[in-house]
């Protein structure tokens, strides 16, 4: 492990690591995701139920998933049923693919549930677009916008990406390119590679911000470096 990765490991809290792992690899840099997984795996191996269940729903190792989920399921169910823990509701919704549990988690402001529910609603809206009136479509899209707004209000990178996309396209709100740019920039500054790409595109095409070829290149390189592109990382180091 490099010194930089070691520093990141000590800086990352358990809650941060769980959030990174549940937000999927594309929502953070390759290094951040790897460190988050190592952090959660280490705590799961110590017998911590929450971390065990998180590994269970995110690993490709079916045997390990069964072992950890069988070991921790009772505790997660207790946290959901008796503590009304939003993260516990979300984890149970992942295991059973249960929309009711997902809504319960979103009602408790779990950011992963808010993003998932908002995305699900918006997809269904467009799947049914031909059979939905314009007014009904606007109401449906507003529900997605509200979900993403609540996630972004908690400084969640995926929430910023989703909210920025709503502003960019006018989904559930008036189109506002300046707000879209600010959302994408917030995601980028939080380390989201897609946010970096979007900021680069905004500077390239002048969406919500004055065109700037140099800044477009800079953010594009940051997005590539975050995904593990060594040439881009070298370019950024030499630019300092």
Task: Identify what each model region corresponds to.
Residues 217-240:
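Terminal, low-structured helical/coil segments at or just beyond the last alpha-helical repeat
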Residues 8-67:
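N-terminal leader/linker segments that initiate helical-solenoid repeat arrays
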Residues 18-22, 37, 49-53, 86-90, ...:
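Alpha-helical tetratricopeptide repeat
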Residues 54-61, 91-96, 116-130, 162-169, ...:
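Hydrophobic face of amphipathic alpha-helices that form TPR/SEL1-like repeat modules
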Residues 32-34, 61-74, 94-101, 127-147, ...:
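Structural signature of tandem alpha-helical TPR/SEL1-like repeats
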Residues 46-48, 60-62, 83-86, 108-112, ...:
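Short helix-capping/linker turns of helical repeat alpha-solenoids
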Residues 43, 78-79, 104-105, 150-151, ...:
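Canonical positions in the second alpha-helix
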